[in-house]
Amino acid sequence: AQRDKQYDQYYDRHIRDQRSKDFYNSPEWAAARLMVLIRDKYLCQVCLREKRITHTMTVHHIIPIREAWERRLDLDNMEATCPACHNAERRRG
């Protein structure tokens, strides 16, 4: 059990981080990100739910890719968010 925990920690720090870095530099991510921004009209969806209009270029994974790698390109798992809302969402989960 201790070895599994150590491996999980190593994996999270080294392998998963690099995989995430590679993903966020991929053409697949660039295409998905653009589709989300167009779909959401470059408006922060969190702000819109609170009746505010904020333009943005940031896309947020609702379920983080570290928890659901298989949903990394699922447009239903992404929304445009302003940097402030994106940072708040990341702190929450």
Regions found by a protein language model. Name each.
Residues 20-21, 59, 70:
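Generic secondary-structure boundary/loop-capping signal
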Residues 28-58, 82-84:
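Short cysteine-rich loop/turn motifs with clustered Cys
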Residues 1-31, 48-53:
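A boundary/linker detector
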Residues 62-63, 88:
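Alpha-helical hydrophobic packing sites
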Residues 63-78:
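Short linker/helix segments within small regulatory modules
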Residues 2, 49-52, 78-93:
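Short Cys/His-centered divalent metal-binding micro-motifs
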